[in-house]
C-alpha cells in the first residue's frame, strides 16, 4: 500500500513540477513601473483572509487569479461600476489555485479561474475543477480556436512570442524563422531567458506538436550553441541586454515591448525604442501565440454573475480596456486595439490546439534539459 502511495506521489510531482517551475520563473525581471506583470502572485492561495466577507444581499463574484496585472483590477472595477456586482480577487500561482479548488471541492467559494498559458488552462480542466461556459455572447466574442473544445475555458487575450532585434545592428530582412536563429550566423548573438520559464517551455512544446520531437530538439540544441550568455532575467532583461550590446537578437513576448514603450521609467522607454519587433515563420508555420484565459469553476456559487463577468471581459468595451493597459492582443475582433498593435499589423500564427502545450510540457522540459538550455 505504501509503495502505491509513494508511486502516486512521485507521478503527481512529475506532472506538476514543469508547470510550477515555469510559472515560478516568470517572477524574474519584474518592474514596478509596468502596467502588467507575467508572474502569478506569490501569496498563499490558502489564506482565507484574502477573501472579503460577503455582506447580506451583496452581489459578488469570486475570482481565483494567477494574473496580477494592474489593468485586471481596473477591468473588474469598471464591471462593478456598471453592474453593482463586486469582484473579489484571490491570488496565487495557478498550481496553488487548482490544488485549492480540488481540495475544497463543493465548499469552494471560487466562481472563476484566470491564468496565463493554454497548457495551464487545460491542466485545470484535466483536474476536474472547471465546467462548460454556456453563453451565446461569449461564443460570439471569442473565436472557436481560442476556446476549449468543451468550452470549459476561453481565451481573454493573446500574446505572441517574437524575435526582437537591435535596430542599429540587425536588419529585419536578415530575420526569417525561429529555426534560423539556430544557424551559425547568429553564433554568440542570441539572448533568451531560462528554460524554467513557462513561455519558453510552451514555445518548445508548440514545436514538438508542429515539427516533431526530433526537429524541436535539433533547434533547441542549435539555439543553445548560439547563446550570447547564460540565460538570465525576464523578457524585459533580454531587451535591456540588447541595448547593452550583450547580444543582437532575443525571444520575448510582444506585450512587454508595449509596456516598456509606455513605462514611467525613461530608460525602459529608450531601450524599447531601439529594438525592432519581428514576427517569425510567416511563410511556414506561423508565429507562436499563447493565451490568457478564464475558466468557470465547477462549483461556482455565483454562476450567473460569473458568466456576466466573462461576457464583459470578452465584450468590446472590456477587451478595449484590457488590451489598452496590458498590450496583449484582444480575442474580440471588434475591440479597439492600442495604436502600437495596429502598427504591427496582421500576422500569421501557429495553428494548434492550446491543450497540446500542456500535453507536451513534460517532453519539452526533458528536451530543454537534455540540450543544456539552463
Give the residues covered by each predicted segment:
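Mature extracytoplasmic/periplasmic domains
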Residues: 292-351
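Short, low-complexity disordered leader/linker segments with a strong preference
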Residues: 1-60
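Short beta-strand->loop
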Residues: 64-67, 149, 165-167, 187-211, ...
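An extracytoplasmic/periplasmic, membrane-proximal ligand-sensing/linker region
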Residues: 215-218, 327-374
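Periplasmic solute-binding protein
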Residues: 118-129, 146-176, 201-205, 289-295
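Early extracytoplasmic/lumenal segment of secretory-pathway proteins
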Residues: 46-123, 374
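Ligand-binding pocket segment of bilobal, Venus flytrap-like solute-binding proteins
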Residues: 206, 212-278
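A structural signal for short loop-to-beta-strand junctions that line the ligand-binding cleft
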Residues: 108-113, 131-163, 179, 189-192
